[in-house]
Regions:
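Short, non-transmembrane cytosolic segments of multipass membrane proteins
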Residues: 2-21, 98-115, 214-242, 343-344
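Terminal membrane-anchoring module of integral membrane proteins
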Residues: 2-59, 159, 235-411
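Short N-terminal secondary-structure initiator segments
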Residues: 31-41, 45, 114-142, 173-178, ...
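Helix-loop-helix junctions within predominantly alpha-helical proteins
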Residues: 56-110, 129-204, 223-238, 288-317, ...
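Generic structural signal for well-ordered, non-membrane alpha-helices
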Residues: 105, 125-132, 213-220, 254-257, ...
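Inner-leaflet juxtamembrane helices
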Residues: 106-127, 201-218, 318-346
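Loop-centered beta-sheet repeat module
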Residues: 199-220, 225, 246-259
Length: 411
């Protein structure tokens, strides 16, 4: 792929700077040992550079998974010790949150190692091929795609800033000695774990956003073809026009299958990471609810530490991040339903053209096979799942409140 012509007045801000966003994402991923993530490869890396980056990726991942957990397990009592038993309960919940991130990092590392070539061949390059196929397609679906990309980009960077502020605030307000140092180190470790898993989540989100854009463009092309078919008239060129429409419908059917395969392969390789993301969201919501309760009990914002406020904002942003990931899958499901409705509006081919009738039937059958994939064969990643997570977190929050009230009576 080549950079767009900057002299074209019709280019949007995204068209002019798209590859800069992708390069930023690639560098951001490489820093955290995710060399496999290259959104739009421009040129092949030299073999020594590629070997170095792969070795760095494995070394960085093993330090996160093996070395640092041993250090924090050794200082477990230091991390969770507190004079205030209610604060200690909050520390336990935060530790559980980081443990979920740690498990997600392990799954992500194993998935990246096993599917290293598949991620490039079955996702990245297949997406590039589809981008070329839809280059002359209607441009309207690009507007929401660009909006979601901007929103995701701003949200992720804002969450990074919030976490860095929280680390500095914890360092500034913490007590002197080993306790403060270990907790600051643990906060930095949790920040790196989040970045590690977020890289793959962003890549999966980008693939799903692209799938949604392609389905919308395909639906518009399909609707235009339906209108052309409805305008057919019994003239001498009728059979020729039917052959042209059959060819166009066959091309659209192949594109639909390619889009389905792209989403299916991406979901298959990232389903365990997405499951970890859902569990992290559950624990984050639980932490957020309990933090707000902690604030209300004190009845004064002046008594609430700055790191607690930052953590609350971060958990809210994390929930929004998970929601838009699920929302993308919800939109894909709705677009498939819209395409099925478009196919049902197709009129009976004139002169009962056999090939055109067959292509309509094949396309309808193809849409029946385009069912949204499930997480580990258990759950659909949609808004209902995010709502279920929020309700479950609130239920666990009630249990935590009961423990909190019990601790208040004892203290």
């Amino acid at each position: 792929m080549t950079d767009p012509d900057p002299d074209d007045d019709d280019l949007t801000f995204w068209d002019r700077h798209e590859f800069k966003f992708y390069q930023y994402g690639h560098v951001y991923a490489v820093i955290y040992g995710q060399v496999v993530i290259d959104y739009v490869p421009q040129k092949a890396l030299k073999r020594p550079v590629k070997v170095f980056l792969i070795c760095y990726s494995h070394l960085f991942s093993l330090v996160l998974i093996v070395v640092l957990p041993g250090y924090f397990c050794y200082h477990f009592r230091t991390l969770t010790d507190s004079v205030d038993p209610r604060l200690q309960l909050l520390l336990y919940v935060s530790f559980a949150n980081t443990a979920i991130k740690y498990a997600t990092v392990i799954v992500t590392y194993l998935a990246n190692t096993v599917h290293f070539e598949a991620i490039n061949q079955k996702c990245t390059y297949r997406r590039m091929h589809l981008e070329k196929e839809f280059k002359k397609a209607p441009k309207e679906p690009k507007i929401p795609f660009e909006f979601f990309m901007y929103f995701k980009f701003c949200l992720i960077n804002l969450m990074m800033i919030i976490q860095v502020c929280g680390i500095f605030a914890q360092y500034g307000e913490g007590e002197k000695g080993t306790v403060s140092q270990v907790r600051v180190h643990f906060s930095i470790y949790a920040f790196v774990l989040w970045n590690y898993t977020e890289n793959m989540a962003d890549y999966c989100y980008w693939i799903n956003a692209s799938v949604l854009k392609y389905y919308r463009q395909l639906n518009l092309q399909l609707d235009h073809l339906r209108q052309d078919m409805a305008n057919l008239k019994p003239t001498g060129m009728l059979l020729h026009r039917c052959c042209e429409l059959s060819d166009r419908l066959e091309v659209l059917r192949r594109r639909c299958q390619e889009i389905k395969d792209l989403q299916k392969e991406s979901f298959r390789m990232h389903q365990f990471q997405l499951m970890g993301l859902m569990l992290s969201t559950l624990i984050n919501n639980l932490t957020n609810f309990y933090t707000l309760f902690h604030m209300l009990v004190k009845q004064s914002l002046e008594d609430v530490s700055y790191p607690v406020l930052v953590g609350s904002f971060y958990a809210t942003g994390f929930y929004i991040d998970t929601y838009i990931v699920a929302l993308m899958n919800e939109h894909i499901k709705q677009e498939l339903e819209g395409m099925a409705l478009t196919m049902r509006r197709f009129a009976e081919p004139p002169e009962r053209d056999v090939r055109l009738t067959r292509e309509i039937e094949h396309f309808s059958l193809e849409l029946l096979n385009c069912q949204p994939p499930m997480l580990c064969g258990i759950l659909h990643l949609d808004r209902r799942l995010v709502y279920l997570i929020a309700v479950t977190a609130f239920s666990y929050f009630i249990t935590l409140v009961q423990f909190d009230l019990l601790l208040r009576k004892k203290s």
